[in-house]
Amino acid sequence: MNIIEVENVSFKYGNSKAYSLRDVNLNVKKGEFLGIIGPSGSGKSTFCLTLNGLIPHSINGEFEGNVFVDGLNTREHSVAELSTRVGLVFQNPDSQLFNMTVLEEVAFALENLGVEREEMWRRIRWALKLVKLWDKREEFPPNLSGGEKQRLAIASVLVMKPKVLVLDEPTSQLDPLGREEVLSLVRLLNKEEKITIILVEHNTDFLLEHADRIVVFDGGRVVMEGKPEEVFENVEFLERIGIRIPTRVKIGYELKKRGITRRAVLSYEEIIAEIAKQLR
């Protein structure tokens, strides 16, 4: 069952002559973990903004096509209504945090929606425990680490109980520890909470291991999609458009070029076995 359906979507920002998205068609299944990759300026972030209605409702430009989220056409429903179905997390957590305590940050959206107090507290406790920030609920958000800030931004979206979580390069400004904290949380949300994940991420090693499907953007278009092992087999094409190749695929590709293997996408066990054969 598709939870998101994108039909012939194109978009051009109001002050631009060029389209940021061109004829994008894409379906996302309920419960799927979808990874999105592409060079800078390829339309990835713009695509994310179409999924919760910020485009076309809040961002000026020319929008063509339709996006359906959980059966709702984003043209016909407000961003507030869509936010209970799609949560959006940006690169910089500071752009989403503006309250005095962690607790107030997570409560903010629920108060605006008029959620009953008992239900509000139940959701807040659930979300903060899930992202491992319950013990820091009285902290001033700017005092948190980068990884903690991003987890707080995720919690502030999770309390809305969205069926889909869209994360636009959530680890790009984090140190290695912060990246691991956030990506571990993303895995948990998909596997245990059954939330559909759409993750724009430069960490292709992570996507190769954990995504169900990869979509490649270039020039505002979807130029490739498939299972991770299928997509990353196209090493030369991905390198040509500026995609970082996962470590084990790089090794496998070198073996393939030397005629040692037929595939570039190999497990580390397969790589070790092939190298061992050559050393005998």
Swiss-Prot record:
GO annotation, cellular component aspect: ATP-binding cassette (ABC) transporter complex
One GO molecular-function entry: ATP hydrolysis activity
Membrane topology reported for the UniProt record: Peripheral membrane protein
Binding site for ATP: G38, P39, S40, G41, S42, G43, K44, S45
Organism superkingdom: Archaea
Alphabetic keyword roster: ATP-binding, Cell membrane, Membrane, Nucleotide-binding, Translocase, Transport
All residue ranges annotated as the ABC transporter domain in the record: 4-244
Compartments where found: Cell membrane
Major site of localization recorded for this protein: membrane
Gene3D superfamilies, per database record: P-loop containing nucleotide triphosphate hydrolases
EC number: 7.-.-.-
Pfam families: ABC_tran
Uppermost EC category: translocase
InterPro entries, per database record: AAA+_ATPase, ABC_transporter-like_ATP-bd, ABC_transporter-like_CS, ABC_transpr_CbiO/EcfA_su, ECF_ABC_transporter_ATP-bd, P-loop_NTPase
UniProt similarity note: Belongs to the ABC transporter superfamily.
Functional summary from the UniProt entry: Probably part of an ABC transporter complex. Responsible for energy coupling to the transport system.
Full protein name: Putative ABC transporter ATP-binding protein PYRAB03730
